Amino acid sequence: MLKEDLINSGAIKFGDFVLTSGKRSGYYIDIKSAYTDPKILDEIGLEISGMVKSGKIAGMELGSVPILVSVSIKTKRPFVIIRKDDLKHGTRKRYIGSINLNEEIDIIDDVATTGGSIMKAAEIIRNNGGIVKRAICVVDREEGAAEMLKENNIELYSIIKASELR
């Protein structure tokens, strides 16, 4: 089971950590390290594949890319990689892949804390004509992401809640 595999892989670390959101935490969920194990990545991909509703998926570079690839292969859905920053060369696009007008896209993330990364991806998709109604993460830290996203008309779904890991 995924929860046990995450714990056994050492993906749950205890100590003093600063999260992407800038918040301090007594624990850290290192999904990126965990999904370097193909068994765990496959489990994550299978779980999320069953939760995807839209015809396309998207996520922020770097953390969600392996998950996007796994889910894309399993569901045969195309994906979009959202860049964290403006590209200074080439096309200068904020994303890789295509976003079509009025196309519904589910966002996938590894860990949701405040929902900031998911919201940033949603804004880029929406600003380019796409529709975002759902986000799916491996772990919801239960620190406000679901509430903030709901205020922006996005439902958050997760495989695991942080309270299940402690």
UniProtKB/Swiss-Prot annotation:
Pathway field: Pyrimidine metabolism; UMP biosynthesis via de novo pathway; UMP from orotate: step 1/2
Annotated InterPro entries: OPRT (IPR023031), Or_phspho_trans_dom (IPR004467), PRibTrfase_dom (IPR000836), PRTase-like (IPR029057)
GO biological process, one term: pyrimidine nucleobase biosynthetic process
Record-level Gene Ontology MF annotations: magnesium ion binding; orotate phosphoribosyltransferase activity
Superkingdom as given in the UniProt entry: Archaea
Root EC class: transferase
Keyword terms: Glycosyltransferase, Magnesium, Pyrimidine biosynthesis, Transferase
Co-factor(s): Mg(2+)
Binding residues annotated for 5-phospho-alpha-D-ribose 1-diphosphate, in chain numbering: R83, K84, H89, D109, D110, V111, A112, T113, T114, G115, G116, S117
Documented EC number(s): 2.4.2.10
Residues annotated to bind orotate: T113, R141
Assigned protein family: Belongs to the purine/pyrimidine phosphoribosyltransferase family. PyrE subfamily.
Self-association and partners: Homodimer.
Physiological role: Catalyzes the transfer of a ribosyl phosphate group from 5-phosphoribose 1-diphosphate to orotate, leading to the formation of orotidine monophosphate (OMP).
Protein name: Orotate phosphoribosyltransferase
Organism (species): Picrophilus torridus (strain ATCC 700027 / DSM 9790 / JCM 10055 / NBRC 100828 / KAW 2/3)
Gene: pyrE
